[in-house]
Amino acid sequence: MGKQLLILLGLLLGLQAFSANTINPDKVYDSSIKTIRVYPVGNALAIPVISLSQMNPLEISFDDLKAKYQNYFYSVELMNADWRSANLSVFDYLQGFNQNRITQYSISSIAIQRYYHYKFTFPNSNCRPTKSGNYIIKVYKDSNPQQIVFTSRFFVVDDQVSILSSIQEPFDGNISKTHQKVQLSVETKKLSFFQPDQIQVQVIQNYRYNDALRVNTPNFVRGSLLEYNSERDLIFPSGKELRWLDLQSFRLKSDRILNFEATANGTIVNVKPDFSRATTPYFIFKDVNGQFLISNSESIDSDNQNDYATVVFTYVPPNRLPLIGETLYLSGSLTNNMLDETAEMKFNAVTRAYQKSLLLKQGYYSYAYILRDKAAPNPMLDFNETEGDHWETENAYSIFIYYRPPGARHDHLIGFTTVHSNQY
């Protein structure tokens, strides 16, 4: 018994030591890990949100290109609204075990690129959350939390408020045709003894967490109704319908593919060069708002039969000259919406264009090109020069309502919804 207790304490200390150094809730630490997906069972395009009352499960899956069995485990950690650790004992927010082995896996069958496909659902009979809030899931090898391979975020909501929201044109004539304003009301009848500034609103556009907008004070309080309708707080550049790439077949070229190259190591897919759309007219096109779907037009088992290819993206800048003072990124779930070297486009002096190669699994992808000012510490991402901004664009806005009750030690997620602008 004493030995078991020491082992348990060691595991808990290891998890806490890792969490103390964890900042990014979506990070891949092992380059052989690909196609990480975390979503509600049955809806691969939805935000990974669990209802505290219903315990609807998430499916978590990933591929390991090392193509040999690995002994993977997972654990979860409660975070605050700013994605810093809540620093609570796991016993305060979790029922069951916080170190669980991933037992469901399969081996790729007809794909040239060999891989192991792992998946599991959460919550499950071994582990379930007892508190609402932000969470990260950590997957690691050999029951050692120091051998982390990736982290990914998810949410647990305890619905205590109702949200009424809409997307409006800003009143400011300078941005009314290029931006969209999120306007919302939060009904708080179920809450008691709270101050309006204890409520925090966060809004993200098209599943990008790295440029979320936050509001801590409502514009109006009408009884139990909090209204947020400022002309400056929740305004987003509209962008355009995102670019798309159909990789469901490596034999038949879709409209966006320039050519295929068959090599001994697999397939290379060269995407047709992309150019700025800043001055092109807006047209309606139903996209998946930066998400991707794993599918295959020639097989029935996408998890295990879909192949991988090296996909080469090319962006041709104006005048074919390098951008001065700005960094160009490939944005979308295909790069995990990261703003780092995994998504950064590099200028090729020979082709006089920016290029980025990604190893992608067969499926359907949507993406955009974004700019970031190198001199600005934390700027809003700029789509205007590469994509253009049009009020008519359909975008997905996910709204999170957080509450820190008096005496509480972490931020509770008490409301969530997703609303679409100009849905066609």
Language-model region placement:
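Aromatic-rich carbohydrate-binding modules that target alpha-glucans
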Residues: 95-118, 209-218, 312-362, 374-405, ...
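Basic K/R-rich, polyanion-interacting modules in nucleoproteins and related proteins
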Residues: 271-324, 413-424
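Low-complexity, Pro/Ser/Thr- and charge-rich linker/hinge segments at domain boundaries
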Residues: 156-179, 390-415
